[in-house]
Amino acid sequence: MRALTLLALLALATLCITGQAGAKPSGAESSKGAAFVSKQEGSEVVKRPRRYLYQWLGAPAPYPDPLEPKREVCELNPDCDELADHIGFQEAYRRFYGPV
């Protein structure tokens, strides 16, 4: 009985392996880069207006961070960016560019 079960499992495994080897990929899978899209195409798919993002919660949309432009300036300077990783953005910006 044990040998019969083992033989049936081996036959099933052989059928599965040979069935997958002969299968051809579908048209969607065969085109190169189909799994990846550009950032612009991806953002168009999930684009939604920010002001309506939290309307269903009854809370207003969050305001943009006023320090974001300064954070970007600090990120463009490799020394400021590295220091910001260690001591924080505001202190690193103050040391390189003056008061925040």
Swiss-Prot record:
Disulphide bond pairs: C74-C80
Lyase is among the record's keywords: no
Keyword line: Biomineralization, Calcium, Cleavage on pair of basic residues, Disulfide bond, Gamma-carboxyglutamic acid, Hormone, Hydroxylation, Metal-binding, Secreted, Signal
Stretch forming the signal peptide: 1-23
Record has Calcium as a keyword: yes
Annotated localization: Secreted
In-chain residues carrying the UniProt-annotated modification 4-hydroxyproline: P60
One GO MF term attached to the UniProt entry: hormone activity
PTM comment, free text: Gamma-carboxyglutamate residues are formed by vitamin K dependent carboxylation by GGCX. These residues are essential for the binding of calcium. Decarboxylation promotes the hormone activity.
Domain of life where this protein originates: Eukaryota
Start and end residues of each Gla domain: 52-98
Binding site for Ca(2+) 1: E68
Residues modified as 4-carboxyglutamate: E68, E72, E75
Cellular component, GO annotation: cytoplasm; extracellular region
InterPro entries assigned: GLA-like_dom_SF, GLA_domain, Osteocalcin, Osteocalcin/MGP
Residue ranges annotated as propeptide in the record: 24-51
Annotated positions binding Ca(2+) 2: E72, E75
Record-listed Ca(2+) 3 binding positions: E75, D81
Record family assignment: Belongs to the osteocalcin/matrix Gla protein family.
Protein purpose: The carboxylated form is one of the main organic components of the bone matrix, which constitutes 1-2% of the total bone protein: it acts as a negative regulator of bone formation and is required to limit bone formation without impairing bone resorption or mineralization. The carboxylated form binds strongly to apatite and calcium. The uncarboxylated form acts as a hormone secreted by osteoblasts, which regulates different cellular processes, such as energy metabolism, male fertility and brain development. Regulates of energy metabolism by acting as a hormone favoring pancreatic beta-cell proliferation, insulin secretion and sensitivity and energy expenditure.
Full protein name: Osteocalcin
Species annotation: Macaca nemestrina
Gene name, Swiss-Prot/TrEMBL: BGLAP
